[in-house]
Each structure stands twice: as structure tokens, then as C-alpha cells.
Amino acid sequence: MNIVFSRDSQVRVMENTVANTEKYFGQFCSLLAAYTRKTARLRDKADQLVKQLIDFANSENPELRATMRGFAEDLAKVQDYRQAQVERLETKVVNPLKLYGAQIKQTRAEIKKFKHVQNHEIKQLEKLEKLRQKSPSDQQMIGQAETRVQRAAVDSSRTTLQLEETVDGFQRQKLKDLQKFFCDFVTIEMVFHAKAVEVYSSAFQTLEKYDLERDLLDFRAKMQGVYGHYDTRLLANTSPPPSVLQSLASQGTLQVQLSRANEDPEHPHANHGRFSLCEWVVKGQPAHCVCGQGGHLMLPGHSL
């Protein structure tokens, strides 16, 4: 009977091992599956962010548009790596943990089989004890009962050895798989984050190089209704440049007016040769006028 009780304690240890594995591996599977799903949802949200960044960039000034598009492209690359992360987690971590349930079920079946053999041995021992108490002189019946007990003990011993091998193999495989699952998990995470850091570094540089002053100039120009940048200060020259004089000569009209003004001191635009050229921005285009004591005289073809 002591051997039977010893085997019973052994079985309880085996059952606890399997039950503990079933409990925690089930929780690992559930949590890692949830982790993978949340990672996939994070990828989806980031894809939406990429789309919004592109839409926003298309509505902005050129400098910001180029920066936002570059940033969106880098963010999209990170999501490609995240997609690979999700697929690898499912393949190398979650799915193997799901399949572990079948192995646990098989080990439980082996333990159940052993317990059946053990119970049979215990019953034969109990019958033998009762027979010895009721009919101590019936040696034939007692001998047959002892034979049955011996057979049950042999079956129980053989089954015990098989079960020990099964549970030992189960424990070894469990520890090996546990190591592999989490090594794969960490490797997948390291690969993703290494790639992500590389791409995010590029994204940071893209954002850091953004020249907001150029966009501010464009914005201020739009606020003033101007679609370019022109120098609105008076030119330093006291006489028109050759290109302007050539234009004046081709038109002819202003040249005559200037000549008359110089000949006639009473002419309203006479300034005795002291003329300066002003540059104005009119309706989005540069226009020139000659400035003197008499006021402003616009070039032909231009009007304020």
C-alpha cells in the first residue's frame, strides 16, 4: 500500500504540472493575442494618420507640403514594418501557443489512463484484505486474489514508468517552447523597433529641416494678395536703367513728354533733369514710374 500511496503523490505532482501549464500558457496565449490585435489596430490608426497628413499637405504651401509628405512617407514605412511585426507575432508566438492545448489534452489523457490502472490496483488490494479478514483459511481464494494484485501492480508499475516519461517529456518540451516563444517575441520586437528608430530618425531630420520662414513669406504674400516677392523700395539709381530707356524709346510717347518738360520750365512735369525711377507692384506685376518735382508719370501701358 505504501507504494500505491507513493504513486498517488507522484500523480498529483504530474497533474499540478499539467494544470499549471494549462493555466498560464492559456493566459499567455490570450494576452499575446490581444497584444497582437492592439498592434494591428495601432497600425490601422497610423495608416489613417498618414492619409490625413497627405490631405493636409496638399492644402498647404510648398515648403510645408514637401515636409509633410516626406514625414507621411516615413510614417507609412513604419506601418509596413508594424504589419510584418503583426504577422510574425501571429505565426511564431500566438499560433504555437494555441496549439499547445492539444498537447496538454494528450498529457491529461495519459494521466487519466494511469489513474485508472492505479485504481484497479487499489481495488485488488482492498479485495485481498477483505478476503483475508473474512476467510483467512481459504488459501485458494487468497492465492487467486494475490495473483490479481500482483498483475495489477505490474500494470501499474509499467504505466507509471510510461507516465513518468510522458510527463518528463512534456515538462522538457514546455520549458523549451516557453524559451522559444519569448525569444521569438523579443526578437520580433527588437527588429521592429530597430527599423522604426531608423525611419523615425529620418522623419525627425525631415521635420527639423523644415524652413517655416519661407512658408510665412508665402502666407503673408497671400494675405496681401501678392503671388510673388518683389522689392518695393525705391531704386538707388537717380536715372532709369538702359533697359527702361530702351522701352521708353520704343514707345516714344513718354520721351516726347520728357523732352518738352525739359525745354519748357513752365511745364507741369519740369524738374530740370532730376528724375528718379520708382518700382511699384501693381495687380501682381511690377510697374515703373518716373518721379520728379512735378509728381509721378507712369510708363506707357501701365496704370496705378
Curated annotation (Swiss-Prot):
Question: Keyword Cytoplasm, does the record have it?
Answer: yes
Annotated spans, BAR-like: 6-217
Annotated GO biological processes are: cilium assembly
* Chief location of this protein within or outside the cell: cytoplasm
Q: What is the effect of changing residue 130 to E?
A: Abolishes ability to induce membrane remodeling in the presence of CBY1
Query: What are the GO cellular component annotations?
Result: centriole; ciliary basal body; ciliary transition zone; cytoplasm
Q: Which UniProt keywords apply?
A: Cell projection, Cilium biogenesis/degradation, Cytoplasm, Cytoskeleton
Question: Which InterPro entries does the record match to this protein?
Answer: AH/BAR_dom_sf, BAR_CBAR1/2, CBAR/FAM92
Instruction: Name its cellular compartments.
Output: Cytoplasm, Cytoskeleton, Microtubule organizing center, Centrosome, Centriole; Cytoplasm, Cytoskeleton, Cilium basal body
Mutation: residue 108 to E; reported impact is: Abolishes ability to induce membrane remodeling in the presence of CBY1
CDD domains (UniProt xref): BAR_FAM92 (cd07598)
**Gene3D superfamilies, per database record:** Arfaptin homology (AH) domain/BAR domain (1.20.1270.60)
List, alphabetically, the SUPFAM superfamilies matched. BAR/IMD domain-like
The record ties this protein, via Pfam families, to: FAM92
Judging by the UniProt lineage, the source's domain of life is Eukaryota
Entry's family note: Belongs to the CIBAR family.
Comment, domains: The BAR-like domain displays limited similarity to other BAR domains.
Q: What subunit structure does UniProt give?
A: Homodimer (via BAR-like domain). Heterodimer (via BAR-like domain) with FAM92A. Interacts with CBY1.
Q: What is this protein called?
A: CBY1-interacting BAR domain-containing protein 2
Species of the source = Homo sapiens
Whichever gene encodes this chain, its name is CIBAR2
